[in-house]
Regions:
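Dinucleotide-binding Rossmann-like beta1-alpha1 core, especially the glycine-rich loop
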Residues: 33-117, 121
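Active-site substrate-recognition segment that forms the wall
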Residues: 2-10, 35-36, 70-74, 187-300
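Short loop/edge segments at beta-strand edges and connector loops
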Residues: 18, 114-115, 161-166, 279-281
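Short beta-strand to alpha-helix junction loop
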Residues: 44-54, 84-89, 133-149, 252-257, ...
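C-terminal catalytic lobe of FAD-dependent flavoproteins
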Residues: 275-358
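Glycine-rich FAD pyrophosphate-binding loop
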Residues: 8-30
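Helical element adjacent to the flavin cofactor pocket in flavoenzyme catalytic cores
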Residues: 126-182, 186
């Protein structure tokens, strides 16, 4: 949807074919917490993805400002806390993040918080935690508001939308009369028949309304077995997740993982005890063998964009900008900066029309 909007804004004729509905209720994008945390995520990914996340922190405000509908966006940093018994794990993580920050020096340096500094940042957490880390500059957005705002924007820009219309690139003959110049395949796991290396990585997320919880920024709990994140949205809505399971199973969340998730959230803030569970959702993230995103051109006029793994919203603007470079110039300088796997056919023609598959 982001790509369709930006292409239409540039004056291209765009059709979008989506297997789902405007609400995108069965997509990983709807379930996600939409945290924009490149340094925090550097613990489990490569420097190129971290640079993509840093790039996105400057691009998201620009992209959101151009939308007619408001979208919650916050850039108040990330807080990381731990219990005393997990201090060794926290020290290991701290050293890792400091080393990663040296590899991507444009990122702001993390700040170590003692009890007094933690109390100033998040007063309610100081009652349970003696130390913490603050990662300045990181942020989050409301993914569901964004998905809805992009639907409105597509209507405003006369993007032709085809809901409940699953398609594959084979349906089209790019460049032929009456056909688009480009087909952009952004289907995630829906493209597995074309991109056999794709796999699903399952995640489980709970949404809780908790008026007694006053967290002001995304907060992560260090735990050797069960680390969690808590992303506070507007109106005391909290998105809480942790699990990452090597499986494309879309069945409901298990009792065990749900109990662990809720127990860990309560351990961070007692106000969750009286919260109300609004939703317990599972979804699978499209992931390539190296857990890194990639863009490839399989034939003239067909570009496949996939493998965003757990970093979809964090790197989406970077993937967008690389794709726009390819469509407009036939190559991308940004992809080199991001160490992004980009496999293009020898000759790419600039686009005037496009069909996006979602």
């Amino acid at each position: 949807r982001l790509l369709a909007v930006e292409l239409a804004r540039q004056g291209h004729r765009v059709d979008i074919y989506d297997a789902g509905s405007p609400a995108a209720e069965h997509s990983a994008a709807t379930v996600a917490a939409a945290m924009l945390a490149p340094l925090a995520e550097s613990a489990i990914t490569e420097p190129g993805v971290v640079r993509m996340g840093h790039h996105a922190l400057t691009r998201w405000p620009q992209l959101l400002a151009a939308l007619a509908e408001p979208v919650f966006f916050q850039q108040a940093g990330t807080l990381i806390v731990w219990h005393r018994q997990d201090a060794a794990e926290a020290q290991r993580l701290t050293r890792q993040l400091e080393a990663n920050q040296h590899h991507v020096p444009e990122l702001p340096a993390l700040q170590k918080l003692d009890g007094a500094a933690l109390a100033q940042a998040e007063p309610t957490l100081a009652q349970r935690f003696a130390q913490g880390l603050y990662l300045p500059g990181e942020g989050q957005l409301d993914n569901r508001q964004l998905l809805a705002a992009l639907v409105v924007e597509m209507q405003r820009l006369s993007v032709r939308t085809h809901w409940h219309s699953p398609q594959s690139p084979e349906t089209f003959t790019p460049g032929a009369p009456g056909q688009p110049d480009w087909v952009l395949d952004c289907r995630g796991l829906g493209a597995k028949s074309q991109w056999s290396a794709l796999r699903g990585v399952r995640g489980e997320v709970v949404r809780i309304h908790a008026p007694d919880v006053t967290l002001q920024r995304p907060t992560r709990l260090v735990h050797p077995r069960y680390p969690i994140y808590i992303a506070p949205k507007e109106d005391h809505l909290f998105v809480i997740g942790a699990t990452e399971i090597e499986s494309d199973d879309l069945s409901p969340a298990s009792v065990r993982s749900t109990l662990e998730l809720l127990s860990a959230a309560y351990a961070v803030h007692p106000g969750f005890a009286e919260g109300r569970i609004l939703e317990l959702a599972t979804q699978c993230r499209p992931t390539l063998p190296d857990n890194l995103p990639a863009i490839r051109q399989t034939r003239q006029g067909v570009l496949e964009i996939n493998g965003l793994y757990r970093h979809g919203f964090m790197i989406a603007p970077a993937m967008l900008d690389v794709t726009l470079e390819v469509l407009n110039t036939g190559q991308s300088q940004l992809s080199q900066r991001f160490d992004l796997a980009l496999d293009l056919a020898p000759a790419s023609v600039p686009a005037t029309s496009a069909a996006a598959l979602a």
